[in-house]
């Protein structure tokens, strides 16, 4: 991809502080060798997540001043609903404080609806790949999360356009194995974060929806990075090069019945989420009832009016093709620099992050010693860069057996916040990892000193294995 400059001017800056290695060693020990627990002031470049860490535009900042903080019926809520209907095509909208808020009010209602119809005796959700909080909400509601992403996603070296696709044969086999009556929902994750921020093709989304309709299974589109997915469809899928991003998005959402969204990603707000419905007004009403005690009144869902206004504006800004070309190009630039330096990554790069294959880079560290987390710590010590593990540590234990779930990949995610860092930062990141590669065999595995029972990677404490 041709490297292009940022399609924006910088109006405000935030100073960041470089620390020395001695300071970082002390900070990492205090954090229990878990970068999630590091204070942000001890981090030079923060690649932990792209969720809520982007820079808002001048229009979004102006929108904050238009906040209507009425408890009920805020005008910003109605603006948000109008934007969702116009841009996504769904007429029923519930705002939430973030994506997991949408999941916590939706999933119990989906299970209850299935059980009311006589099904879901052994409830399961099927996805191309559940992300961590999504799987946690499934399991906390007594259901099982099953991933059926294409096997091509697990060959990080080989190029394939659609490493976020469902394995359609495996999807059909899973429905047959558990019985359609037990499948509460199919969750289409766009883009597929856990396989490397990889896109799912329109043809795959269409076929998944056709299979779901055959079995009367509702489809939820997990929509955190829907704009990036639409950009990949425009670039790679035959028949879409002449369509606008907005046209592609409207078609994508015809292959779902409802959506959950962490609006902290593509819509570029610091807080916010959505739970929206295409036709099922009865389910919408059930979820709204649950929203009130869990998230807040139905016209604010845990958000201030000003935050809903920024979200309504950001929904459209995130669809800007020039911005998406720059944004995904920056991720690709970092990926190509790393590949040129001999760092194994999930190839091709996805939309929001570069995923380093720690299993290849650190073959001496077994999965049960969390190689990607070990690399995460080493990168922080090397250069003050915080990233995040996507592998065995994140995947966790089977809630029924207590055994570690086998992770097909051990990835270190270098997540690029939107409109925050320049390509000079990307060069610094690449130089640090390439330098670290020459000493990779010195990196040691990790073991727990404290392991939480749910979503352990957030607050676990570890120590190096000597």
Curated annotation (Swiss-Prot):
Enzyme Commission (EC) number: 4.1.99.1
Belongs to which family?
Belongs to the beta-eliminating lyase family.
* Top-level class of the enzyme under EC nomenclature: lyase
Reading the lineage from the top rank, the first entry is: Bacteria
The record's note on quaternary structure and interaction partners says: Homotetramer.
Pathway noted in the entry:
Amino-acid degradation; L-tryptophan degradation via pyruvate pathway; indole and pyruvate from L-tryptophan: step 1/1
Recorded GO MF terms: tryptophanase activity
NCBIfam families in the record: PRK13238.1, tnaA_trp_ase
Q: Which reaction does it catalyse?
A: L-tryptophan + H2O = indole + pyruvate + NH4(+)
The record's listing under Pfam families reads:
Beta_elim_lyase
N6-(pyridoxal phosphate)lysine modifications at? 265
Cofactor(s) required for function per UniProt: pyridoxal 5'-phosphate
Keywords of the record: Lyase, Pyridoxal phosphate, Tryptophan catabolism
Identify the InterPro entries for this entry. Answer: ArAA_b-elim_lyase/Thr_aldolase, Beta-eliminating_lyase, PyrdxlP-dep_Trfase, PyrdxlP-dep_Trfase_major, PyrdxlP-dep_Trfase_small, TNase, Tryptophanase_CS
Give a yes or no for keyword DNA repair in this entry: no
**Species:** Yersinia enterocolitica serotype O:8 / biotype 1B (strain NCTC 13174 / 8081)
> What CDD domains does the annotation carry?
Tnase_like (cd00617)
> What's this protein's name?
Tryptophanase
């Amino acid at each position: 991809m041709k490297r292009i400059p940022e399609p924006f001017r910088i109006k405000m800056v935030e100073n960041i502080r470089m620390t020395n290695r001695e300071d970082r060693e002390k900070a990492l020990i205090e954090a229990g060798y878990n970068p999630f627990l590091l204070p942000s002031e001890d981090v030079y470049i923060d690649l932990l997540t792209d969720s809520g860490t982007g820079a808002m535009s001048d229009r979004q900042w102006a929108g904050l001043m238009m906040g209507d903080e009425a408890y009920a019926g805020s005008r910003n809520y109605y603006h948000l609903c109008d934007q969702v209907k116009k841009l996504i095509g769904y007429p029923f909208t519930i705002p939430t404080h973030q994506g997991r808020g949408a999941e916590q009010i939706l999933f119990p209602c989906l299970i209850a609806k299935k059980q009311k119809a006589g099904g879901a005796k052994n409830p399961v959700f099927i996805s191309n790949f559940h992300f961590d909080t999504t799987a946690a909400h499934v399991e906390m509601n007594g259901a099982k999360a099953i991933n059926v992403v294409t096997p091509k996603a697990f060959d990080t070296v080989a190029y394939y356009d659609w490493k976020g696709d469902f394995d359609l044969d495996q999807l059909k086999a899973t429905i047959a194995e558990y019985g359609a009556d037990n499948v509460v929902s199919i969750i289409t994750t766009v883009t597929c974060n856990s396989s490397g921020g990889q896109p799912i093709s329109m043809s795959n989304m269409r076929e998944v929806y056709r299979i779901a309709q055959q079995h009367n299974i509702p489809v939820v589109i997990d929509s955190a990075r829907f704009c990036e997915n639409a950009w990949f469809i425009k670039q790679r899928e035959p028949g879409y090069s002449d369509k606008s991003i907005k046209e592609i998005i409207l078609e994508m959402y015809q292959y779902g019945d409802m959506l959950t969204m962490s609006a902290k990603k593509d819509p570029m707000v610091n807080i916010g989420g959505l739970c929206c419905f295409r036709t099922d007004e009865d389910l919408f009403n059930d979820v709204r009832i649950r929203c009130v005690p869990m998230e807040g009144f139905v016209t604010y869902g845990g958000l201030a009016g000003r935050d809903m206004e920024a979200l309504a504006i950001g929904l459209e800004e995130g669809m800007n093709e020039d911005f998406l070309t720059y944004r995904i190009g920056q991720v690709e630039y970092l990926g190509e620099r790393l590949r040129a330096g001999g760092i194994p990554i999930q190839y091709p790069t996805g939309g929001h992050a570069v995923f380093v294959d720690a299993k290849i880079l650190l073959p001496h560290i077994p999965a049960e010693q969390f190689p990607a987390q070990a690399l995460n710590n080493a990168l922080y010590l090397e250069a003050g860069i915080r990233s995040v593990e996507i592998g065995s540590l994140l995947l966790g234990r089977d809630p029924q057996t207590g055994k570690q779930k086998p992770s097909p990949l051990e990835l270190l995610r270098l997540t690029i916040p939107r409109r925050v860092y320049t390509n000079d930062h990307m060069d610094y990141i690449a130089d640090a990892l390439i330098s670290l590669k020459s000493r990779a065999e010195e990196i040691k595995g990790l073991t727990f000193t404290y392991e939480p029972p749910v979503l352990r990677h957030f607050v676990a404490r570890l120590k190096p294995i000597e």
